[in-house]
Design a protein with these regions (language model features):
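Histidine-centered active-site/metal-ligand motif
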Residues: 13, 47, 62-64, 90, ...
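Acetyl-CoA-dependent GNAT
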Residues: 68-69, 142
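Structured loop/turn residues at beta-strand edges in well-structured enzyme cores
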Residues: 9, 59, 86, 113, ...
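Short, charged/polar surface micro-motifs in flexible loops or helix N-caps
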Residues: 56-57, 61, 71-73, 98-101
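Core segments of cupin and vicinal oxygen chelate
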Residues: 6, 17-68
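Vicinal oxygen chelate
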Residues: 2-4, 10-19, 51, 76-186
Length: 186
């Protein structure tokens, strides 16, 4: 028997309780791009399952699930990065590379999705949005490991705020600082 916890690979999936399953379904499929892979049947509540796509084009059993809450369920305040409520702050969704991320960010802007924050972190370049139920979503691509691996604390503490509207919100530079090493372009 081990005397300490075994480190997991990571988070497997996220389940969100939502007000209106159809509205949330459209957001997560048409705006974010997840694919619906399953739906619970013969249950007293509605729940659907969604998957992203791996680099090999494969789907999983689910990365995300949406469960419709009863009408009397309490809502939440508008999303903010500051912890003003107990529960989920945000979920981060990664695109495979800078080019696909830039296409997604432009797509979001063209669809009228409000950018709440646009930030270059020390390990990601990110846009923060919210879903129809106010869940915070970080749309990101990860910078190369050599940018942050020698000083994770330094990378976590780096934050460059960028414009959230107009063409400026779509500009992404590759002159990233390197934490604990020489400069690398993403």
């Amino acid at each position: 028997m081990s005397d300490r916890a075994i480190t997991p690979r990571g988070i497997n999936h996220l389940v969100l309780n939502v007000r209106d399953l159809e509205v949330s379904h459209r957001f997560w499929t048409e705006i974010i791009g997840f694919r619906q892979v399953a739906e619970l049947k013969n249950r007293p509540f509605k729940m659907r399952f969604y998957s992203g796509v791996s680099e090999d084009g494969e789907v999983t059993h689910h990365d995300l699930a949406l469960a419709e809450a009863p009408p009397e369920a309490a809502g939440q305040d508008a999303w903010t990065m500051q912890p003003k409520r107990v529960g989920l702050n945000h979920v981060a969704i990664a695109w495979p590379d800078r080019a696909s991320w830039l296409k997604q960010v432009e797509f979001l802007q063209n669809k009228g999705v409000k950018f709440l924050r646009r930030v270059n972190h020390g390990m990601t370049h990110s846009v923060y949005i919210e879903d129809p139920d106010g869940h915070g979503i970080e749309v990101l691509y990860e910078l190369p490991r050599e940018v942050w691996e020698n000083d994770i604390d330094g990378a976590q503490n780096f934050s460059e705020r960028l414009p959230t509207e107009g063409a400026e919100a779509l500009v992404d530079t590759t002159d990233n600082p390197v934490f604990g090493g020489a400069k690398v372009s993403a």
